[in-house]
Amino acid sequence: MSAGSRNKHSKFRNDDQLDISKEEFSRIKEALGNEEFRKLFFDYVDEIQDPANRKIYEEEITQLEKERGVEVRFIHPQPGFVVKTSLDGELKCFINIASSPEIEAPHNEVATNPENGNRGLSWYIPMAQTSSRDDADAKNNHCKVFDVVFHPDALHLAKRNSQFRKCLVDTALDAVEREYQVSLDRANLKFPKLDYKGIARPTVIRKLAENPTAEQLEPHPLQNIYPTAPPTSNPEPRVHPMKTKAAPVPEFTIPRYSIKHSHDVDLSEYTDELDAKLHVTVPRNLVVEIELPLLRSTAECQLDVTSKSVYLLSEKPGAKYRLKMDLPFTVDDKAGSARFDTDLRRLSITLPVVRSSVPQQRDMHDTLRHFSREDSGVELHSNSESPVEEEEADADLSDSKADTSETVTPTATPVHSAPTPFLKKSVHYQLPAKFDCNVLDNVMAFVLHVANVQPDSIEQLREQRSLHIQFATIGSGYYPTHYAFYVELPADEEGGSAIENVEAEAWDNNVVLKLCLSSQSKSPIRYMAGLDATDLNEYPVHGQYTVKPKRRDAQNKESAPLDVKFDHNKESLEVTIRPVPSATEEDEVEEQHEESHEEHQQHAQNKKPSKKQRKRNKKERSLSESACEDIVQEQHAENPAPPAKNFLKLPQRKQRSYSECNDSSVGSGASQRGILKRFSRYGPRPSMSDSCSSIDDYSSSYSCSVDASGASLFSQSFGGIPEEDRSDAGLSESCKKTVRFNDHITKQVFRLDSSILGQRKKNQKRRDLKLRAQQRRLSEGDSVDYEESRGDALKPQGKASNKGNKLHDSGLDLTGTAAGHGSHSDADAKNAMMFEMDEDDVM
């Protein structure tokens, strides 16, 4: 037993131990070696132990204390009987029940039990306690000794009455536990054949004297310095309430025990492998230590060890122990060992812990490697259940399935088992925050916007009109989040909608569900969706797409004859190309034309475009291919059969037109192809091969230029290449694709002896020449007149200019020969002058 445990229940602390120096120790050693000193020392010991000398010592102490106004009584314990038990389940202790005539005699009174009304005797038993002391038992083992002193009459009654003896023992045990704050083993009390354990030591009871002496009555010189002392009175003895009901004494005592985790140092756990630290928290062995201070050997007890528990039983009188303990890990009960320390009365049990096998470790390693893949870094919610709970739920589900299979009997009576729920009760599921639905023919597609979905976690339950699916995602912390989605088609649809096949695909950012409906069912217009069948909401189907065959009406309209009309104006020429409508369509076309014309006139009056805006209107932004498709669908939905009516109003520009030698080639042939030249007023002018357009069909928009004399000379320009199955010419004009090539090659030559400043001057000179050429080009005075005349001409043309510039300019001159303001020679002269300016700029 260690020194700490020895002094645990002693009033002596480490700082109260004998502390001597080396010099003092050597002096004591030298003195004890002297025979004369030893003789004197033994004489002193005999004098102290002599009862006559002790009586003289007590009288002197009593007289000295009486002079101080304190009455002192020495109590000498007389042997009675001894009680043996254990202290806190780990140390043997002895309680001496002694007697002394200095203690007040016990007395009783008649009392009534308040619980049942029975009459009995209530005993008043005075007692006194001495300080605890350390001692040794018969085998020289450490033990603890307590003295409890009663009046001799109390011990006399205890010898004659067993119930009073038990009451006296319980009173002594309660006094020791209350005074020293310890726990005594009441189930294993022994009464050895001893009258007293150890050597009796007297104790002192002090109290103030009732009759003060003459010296105390004399005033003290320091009496006025200190505050007035409180009046002295005899304190009443401390009375502890008697127990009306005895505490139940257990038949067996639960011994003290401890479980220690033993772990070896394994260098393989300090590597960077994924499975290196799988068993860091799992110990190698479990060491169970049980304190049995009242047992001499383990032959007197029974020990049973299983894979998950330890059971100990001792039925020896005076050492009754019983312990049933559950182990925190599964152990190998056949490979354990036990050892009993007779000195410490301690039983040590070593049990090896069972670890997972190699296949289980390999499966766990694969699972960790699957979880450790890189994700997209999207943070997910952490309010789902843990993987351990999920595994436990799976185990419970498998056990329930096994129990169900075992209860099935081969009798003819059918056994109806409850259906297993699709969603696990121990797992918290979430509904995807966002999902879309589209329908194409008999295919209904759902897009669930959930990222990082594990493909192997997708499970589905398909019925005739419903589908239930669940899946899980793994976030950056390897923590799963479970989702569920339930969709149900309404049963009141005409013709019904039955699900024949389901396909689920997991992508990086979403999950795509494809529901293949039966061929007889119609496309649903709404559906019910939610987490499960008990929580559903109704949603409409937004996107419905059907593949329709090409109608014959469109083919008839393409082959219909065209009606071409020319409207002459001072500044422009309006060409209208329309198919010959039927009698029923003429009224609708006229009404739409009148309404649109009124809207454009009103818009033109409210807003007058400035010069910069009129210049910007020449250029039009082309639409993307997807935007064109959306516009076509909206136009088809609003006007199923729009009339093929196009109005092209082009401003006067200085352009090149076809010469007279090309009249025959232009006017002949149904399908015409031409290479047209179109340049801006202020931009550079490319060559004839820079731009080209080809037309193979009459379904596109037409833009013609006819001279004022009505001759056969005209130029045709087509706004763009019409796309397949498109009857809207204006839309194909905005969606045309143009490829331009420039045959001018820019060459820059640097001389080795030239400086950067000289090159800068050369560039500045070239810019000055170009700016001078532009100013010379605008010095004719026709640019301002051209802008003003063009602005007056654009006002009545609200239909073509205020509609968002839906038509591109084909680049063909429609005004050069129509109004008669200039001749062919004037246009050719201006164009020749422009080309000469370009050549000067290039050189």
Curated annotation (Swiss-Prot):
The family this protein is said to belong to: Belongs to the PIH1 family. Kintoun subfamily.
Protein name: Protein kintoun
Compositional bias segments (type: Basic residues): 605-619, 761-775
Annotated Basic and acidic residues bias: 564-573
Acidic residues biased stretches: 387-397, 584-593
The encoding gene: Nop17l
Subcellular location: Cytoplasm
Function: Required for cytoplasmic pre-assembly of axonemal dyneins, thereby playing a central role in motility in cilia and flagella. Involved in pre-assembly of dynein arm complexes in the cytoplasm before intraflagellar transport loads them for the ciliary compartment.
Main location: cytoplasm
GO cellular component: cytoplasm
